[in-house]
Amino acid sequence: MILARGEILKLIKDGSLGIEPFTEDVVRENGLDLRVGNEYAIYAFENQVIDPCELESTRHLFSIVEAKDGRIIIPPRSFALLTTMEYVKFPRDVIGFCNLRSTLARYGLGVPPTIIDTGFEGNITIEVINNSGNYVVLRPGMRFLHVVLAKTIGEAKYQGKYLGQRGVTPPKGLKGECS
């Protein structure tokens, strides 16, 4: 069951769904519009062979950058890891499906299918892909990520690698997980 504005506001009011900082305009008709944070991550190197199965950490592969002059510039046919301004805390029976706002998609931007798990807590780090041949500018504080909330049947507690993340978080290595 997808949650509409009224149900989302009830979850926020009763403390089940946490959003910090919170402004009511973040709550839309059928989801949340989260805002761009102040930092982003891009690859520090190009033309490297990256094998996630051989890495314990990937921090050395990325440069974490503060938005200069209030702008994040995503080069053509490239991507950046962005973080949300908001720190969210999801209930154990609500999941979030992430999409880019359609206006931004019309400029050639996209995000891969991304789910916010039940019980997740932290800033959302998400890959924003520039599929266009142009440089596209995003600005901290602008609404960019639309999150559709749905109730799950039963509850689950998130125990993943990214619990409690703050700011933009590069991927974790997969060493030990691959056969």
Swiss-Prot record:
<dbReference type="GO" id="GO:0006226">
    <property type="term" value="P:dUMP biosynthetic process"/>
</dbReference>
<keyword id="KW-0378">Hydrolase</keyword>
<keyword id="KW-0546">Nucleotide metabolism</keyword>
<protein>
    <recommendedName>
        <fullName>dCTP deaminase</fullName>
        <ecNumber>3.5.4.13</ecNumber>
    </recommendedName>
</protein>
<feature type="binding site">
    <location>
        <position position="165"/>
    </location>
    <ligand>
        <name>dCTP</name>
    </ligand>
</feature>
<feature type="binding site">
    <location>
        <position position="117"/>
    </location>
    <ligand>
        <name>dCTP</name>
    </ligand>
</feature>
<dbReference type="Pfam" id="PF22769">
    <property type="entry name" value="DCD"/>
</dbReference>
<dbReference type="InterPro" id="IPR011962">
    <property type="entry name" value="dCTP_deaminase"/>
</dbReference>
<comment type="subunit">
    <text>Homotrimer.</text>
</comment>
<keyword id="KW-0547">Nucleotide-binding</keyword>
<dbReference type="GO" id="GO:0008829">
    <property type="term" value="F:dCTP deaminase activity"/>
</dbReference>
<dbReference type="InterPro" id="IPR033704">
    <property type="entry name" value="dUTPase_trimeric"/>
</dbReference>
<comment type="similarity">
    <text>Belongs to the dCTP deaminase family.</text>
</comment>
<comment type="pathway">
    <text>Pyrimidine metabolism; dUMP biosynthesis; dUMP from dCTP (dUTP route): step 1/2.</text>
</comment>
<feature type="binding site">
    <location>
        <begin position="101"/>
        <end position="106"/>
    </location>
    <ligand>
        <name>dCTP</name>
    </ligand>
</feature>
<dbReference type="GO" id="GO:0000166">
    <property type="term" value="F:nucleotide binding"/>
</dbReference>
<dbReference type="GO" id="GO:0006229">
    <property type="term" value="P:dUTP biosynthetic process"/>
</dbReference>
<comment type="function">
    <text>Catalyzes the deamination of dCTP to dUTP.</text>
</comment>
<dbReference type="InterPro" id="IPR036157">
    <property type="entry name" value="dUTPase-like_sf"/>
</dbReference>
<feature type="active site" description="Proton donor/acceptor">
    <location>
        <position position="127"/>
    </location>
</feature>
